[in-house]
Structure formats: structure tokens, C-alpha cells
Amino acid sequence: MIEISCASIQSVGKGNAKLIEFQYKREKENILISLKTDSTQIGTFHRIATIIYALKMDIISGELSTVIEQGNEYTIDSFILQADGGDTTKVAFQLGMMMDSVFSKNAKFEEILEKLQIQEPAVATFFKETPEFIFSDLPEKNRTCLYLESSAGRGLLYYVSRILMQNQINILSATIETDMETGRAKDSFYLTDGSGQMFASTDLALKIRREILAPIQSNSR
């Protein structure tokens, strides 16, 4: 069942239960959205970033978190989005409806991707000006922090989150920031590997860095 008002979408399934709470409002020329879902598996943020990118929006700031309420685990995210022209209210509503489809228990993400016909972002432009990738383990929290600083642009988080997902990296929380004066993205991701362990000092961190930077490395040959 889906309940829709001018500012929120809520979907609660039966049997194979699913929960999606989506709210949005205009914030000057931007859109502020919040999302709560019981989908917490690896790749959850990539699904969100994919839909945002497909609708020609860019995440300029945001917070990602994983919480436990009454013994159940939830993903709670909030973002400020910059829309690429058009009717921002209409785009935000469309975003909410697509989120419901993406997180449906019966949805196949690959089929949704085919329908969206997403074009790859110009990845090389993100990393041409001294990108920073700093992996550091936080033993007291049993997680790895990835600090990423690069040129900002639509599709950056879609691209980075896809590589993290492909390497079975779980995003437990994150802070997304854009310095509007310098045009630099300054993002911090708190991660574990597929086994729930830290990995900053392992070959996996080097592999992720290498894969993220692959487009500019191939262009330099």
C-alpha cells in the first residue's frame, strides 16, 4: 500500500515486509529529501544514488546512517539535491515513486537499470585535479573511514558507490559535503568489508582506489 501526499510517500508491504518512508520539500532552488527504509544490504546507497543521477539531480550534501529501532535495522538518509532545471516538485515526486519501485522486494535492480538507460558520467573530470583518497581504520568503532576529496559533479557518488558495491563494501554511515566556493566534494564514508571487518591496511583498499582512478590512469597512457 502506498500513501501519497504533496510532501511524502510511505509504502509498507505485507508478507515480505518492506518499509519506505520518503519525504521531500523545496529548499530555495534545491530539494531536501529524507528516506527511511528497512533495506540495509550492501548496495542500498548505490540504488539511491542511481535514481538521483538518472533523474538528472546531483547530491550536494547529505547524511547517511544505519540505526536499530526495536531490534530492527533501518537505513536513514537525508540529502540536499540540485536539480538540472525543470519542475523541482515534479522531479521530487517522481524520485519518491521510483524509490518505491527500487526497494520493492520483487524488483530486479538490473531490469530497472535497463529501463533507465543511464549514460556514464564524465568520470575523468572528477579526478583530474589532485584527488585525495585516505583510508583509515577506526578500531574503537570497527569500521574504516574513506575520506574522498575531488572535483564535484553530477554522477560522482553514483560512480563511487557502484565500485564500493562491486567490492562488497557496506556503507554504515557517511557525510557528503560540497564546497560551493571551490567546487570540491569532501565526503567521508564509514565502511566495513563483506565480512564486517576493517580493511584500510589490506589489498582491498588499494584495489578500490585503483578502480576508482582507472579512468584517468587509462587516459594518461
Outline where the language-model segments fall.
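Regulatory modules associated with amino-acid/nitrogen control
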Residues: M1-R221
